[in-house]
A protein has these predicted regions:
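Ribonuclease/tRNase effector modules and their secretory precursors
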Residues: 1-174
Length: 174
């Protein structure tokens, strides 16, 4: 039996092989399927989890609380928005904010082969790879720009409003 994403996130990756693939979800949530994301397992790595939960001013260290990172599989079930994010990548805005009050976003490479196997995954297996999860100050304006350009395939106006309110409240409290 494989160790779950939430358990590894809460442990900040300590004690796990840093290169090992970590299953986030066994298949793509329905809300993401409607955005055209292929129905494949969603995968991450311990190395990425360590970077995301490390507080630092250095590049690629985002300082996400482990409990917030652990909730990402649930948050992916009802995204705020799904939009193009560069060459073949997709951004999924989540209805949550980080400790600084910045809206949370997950970036994905879609239908990519794993370079390393491990656990329930084989090397070369196709997955939707979660590249990174972090708070992004400009996320709400990026969603609006993607909508205006017709590049936002899922959009929940009520959730976007809720996210904006959460972000303002957390920033005031910080």
């Amino acid at each position: 039996m494989w160790t779950g994403f939430a358990e590894i996130a809460k442990a900040r990756g300590r004690g796990y092989n840093r290169q090992a693939p970590v299953p986030v979800l066994p298949e793509t949530p329905k809300a993401l399927l409607t955005a055209g994301i292929p129905n494949l397992p969603i995968c991450h790595t311990v190395r990425h989890i360590v970077r995301e939960t490390t507080i630092s001013n250095r590049s690629h260290r985002h300082g996400i609380e482990p409990s917030l990172l652990a909730s990402v599989p649930e948050l992916l079930q009802a995204p705020v928005a799904v939009f193009k994010a560069g060459a073949g990548r997709v951004a999924v805005a989540l209805e949550a904010t980080d400790a600084m009050g910045q809206p949370l976003v997950a970036y994905f490479d879609l239908a990519v082969p794993l370079s390393v196997g491990g656990g329930q995954f084989r090397s070369g297996e196709l997955v939707n790879f979660m590249l990174s999860v972090y708070g992004r100050e400009s996320l709400i304006s990026e969603i609006e720009s993607a909508r205006a350009a017709g590049e936002c395939s899922v959009f929940n106006e009520e959730a976007l409003f809720s996210l904006a309110v959460q972000a303002l409240q957390r920033r005031k409290a910080a």
